[in-house]
Amino acid sequence: MQLRLSSGNVLNEKVHKVGIIALGSFLENHGAVLPIDTDIKIASYIALKASILTGAKFLGVVIPSTEYEYVKHGIHNKPEEVYSYMRFLINEGKKIGVEKFLIVNCHGGNILVESFLKDLEYEFDIKVEMINITFTHASTEEVSVGYIIGIAKADEETLKEHNNFEKYPEVGMVGLKEARENNKAIDKEAKVVKRFGVKLDKKLGEKILNNAIEKVVEKIKEMIR
């Protein structure tokens, strides 16, 4: 069957060889404002939007996620389980002509799987790249992006509740003592959140989201040059 590769809103015919995969987390507490699957919803939104704008193939989401052992705010998997699912998606993607894979990751803990990317490239003789778009956990940036894509309940009362760090210790990781003790970057971010609190900034959310989508679009353009 001869496929009409130039049809539709696509950058060019080469873009059909690029596949986009969303990577995040489905089971994490995000305070009162955001749902437990915030990370994968943001990753999926960005990945799908970039796919629509370029014509690259959106291949779906990775269901498992992983996390540093000292960060306890959800239910996660071993890095090997994430790798196994990525391997499945890449194997299926290759069957439909994808040769270059771009993973859009919006969960910090998943950075642990980056070491497996070369293994995937070697096994399947393909190119794999990963873009990490992460935020201070359940803080102003993530709340604002979540609001723009429609997943945040950010009325005044809920935001006030969200800023109760004793009830929601995962917000900014302010109350996650073990995580703060083991990671200086987490501790630094937590201090900022505790001092200034979490707010809704619609303009900031729009700016971050648009910049993230543009970053993925530019990477896709780079991959088909």
Swiss-Prot record:
E.C. no: 3.5.1.102
Q: Which GO terms describe its biological process?
A: F420-0 metabolic process; riboflavin biosynthetic process
What does the record give as the function of this protein?
Catalyzes the hydrolysis of the formamide of 2-amino-5-formylamino-6-ribosylamino-4(3H)-pyrimidinone 5'-monophosphate (FAPy) to form 2,5-diamino-6-ribosylamino-4(3H)-pyrimidinone 5'-phosphate (APy).
Indicate the quaternary assembly.
Homodimer.
Lineage, uppermost ranks: Archaea, Methanobacteriati, Methanobacteriota, Methanomada group, Methanococci
Similarity annotation:
Belongs to the creatininase superfamily. FAPy deformylase family.
Give a GO molecular function annotation for the protein: 2-amino-5-formylamino-6-(5-phosphoribosylamino)pyrimidin-4(3H)-one formate-lyase activity
- Free-text comment on the cofactor: Requires one Fe(2+) ion for activity. Requires an additional second metal ion that could be Fe(2+) or Zn(2+).
Species in which this protein is naturally found: Methanocaldococcus jannaschii (strain ATCC 43067 / DSM 2661 / JAL-1 / JCM 10045 / NBRC 100440)
**Where along this sequence does the record place binding of Fe cation 2?**
30, 39
Q: What does the UniProt keyword field contain?
A: Hydrolase, Iron, Metal-binding, Zinc
Q: For this protein, what reaction is catalysed?
A: 2-amino-5-formylamino-6-(5-phospho-D-ribosylamino)pyrimidin-4(3H)-one + H2O = 2,5-diamino-6-(1-D-ribosylamino)pyrimidin-4(3H)-one 5'-phosphate + formate + H(+)
Q: What is this protein called?
A: 2-amino-5-formylamino-6-ribosylaminopyrimidin-4(3H)-one 5'-monophosphate deformylase
User: InterPro entries annotated for this entry?
Assistant: Creatininase-like_sf, Creatininase/forma_Hydrolase, FAPy_deformylase
- pH-dependence of activity, as noted: Optimum pH is 7-8. Has approximately 80% maximal activity at pH 6.5 and 40% activity at pH 8.5.
Which Pfam families does the UniProt entry name for this protein?
Creatininase
Instruction: Give the EC class as a word.
Output: hydrolase
Cofactors needed by this protein, per the record, are: Fe(2+); Zn(2+)
Pathway noted in the entry: Cofactor biosynthesis; coenzyme F420 biosynthesis; Cofactor biosynthesis; riboflavin biosynthesis
Which residues hold Fe cation 1? 28, 39, 107
